[in-house]
Design a protein with these regions (language model features):
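Short helix-perturbing small/polar motifs within transmembrane alpha-helices
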Residues: 10-28, 56, 91, 95-144, ...
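Alpha-helical transmembrane segments and their lipid-water interface positions
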Residues: 31, 82-86, 126-130, 155-162, ...
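Membrane-interface alpha-helices at helix entry/exit sites of multi-pass transporters
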Residues: 66-74, 141-148
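Membrane-embedded alpha-helical bundles of multi-pass transporters/translocases
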Residues: 71, 76-79, 91-118, 168-221
């Protein structure tokens, strides 16, 4: 882990929290849009949410677990309310008008609450697993293990809370199938695309940090 000033950590906390919030909001909207791939039911949210695990793993690797946990706790409450508002306004992918906020939508509220619980569970587990394995000489070990464990807890918790006995008949009937397929796609996408992306971004960020450290050292000298 590198040494950072308090100002750098505050900036990282702000921008990474904003990134997490944007991914959560978009995923909560996209999870309302089911798709079928090779006969298996899943949602578009399977393709957006892995970005959070990529960001969290890079945060733990570069800034350390404490900052990653601060981001999780900073994002949880805002994500709950903003996700409900956005998902109500764009219910089932269609603009409902601002009057949609004047009445309570149980379907959307369950999605927002499920996202709140699943995000906290999945991210805390992701940070814990990654932090335990981050010193392993195999660079891919920590992100792979944290992705597998974090995603399974996040996905199953989310779909159970959001769609078990849901008023949406399709999701109520297929939530378990969709959850398992969603998890499989998340893992596949993460291992095929996000794991290599993690390696590339990690090397790029570490190189930039090393270059900045050298410049700072020269200026100090």
């Amino acid at each position: 882990m590198n040494s950072f000033t308090q100002s750098q950590r505050v900036k990282a906390l702000f921008w990474l929290s904003l990134f997490h919030l944007l991914v959560i909001i978009s995923s909560n909207y996209l999870v309302q849009l089911p798709i079928s791939i090779f006969g298996f039911h899943t949602t578009w949210g399977a393709f957006s949410f892995p970005f959070i695990f990529l960001a969290t793993d890079l945060t733990v690797r570069i800034f350390g677990a404490p900052l990653a946990r601060r981001i999780i706790f900073a994002v949880m409450i805002p994500a709950l309310f903003v996700s409900y508002a956005i998902s109500s306004l764009f219910y089932m992918g269609s603009w409902q008008g601002f009057e949609a906020l004047t009445h309570f939508n149980l379907f959307v509220a369950r999605i927002a609450a499920a996202s709140f619980m699943a995000y906290a569970l999945g991210q805390i587990l992701d940070v814990h697993v990654f932090n335990r394995l981050r010193q392993n000489h195999r660079w891919w070990m920590a992100p792979t293990a944290s992705t597998l464990f974090g995603n399974v807890s996040d996905t199953l918790a989310f779909f159970f809370i959001a769609f078990w006995r849901s008023p949406d008949a399709f999701m109520a009937e297929h939530w378990m199938e969709i959850a398992l397929v969603d998890y499989a796609f998340k893992v596949l996408i993460s291992l095929v695309f996000f794991l290599p992306m993690y390696g590339v971004l990690l090397n790029m960020l570490l190189k930039r940090l090393a270059d900045k450290s050298e410049i700072t050292a020269l200026q100090a000298g």
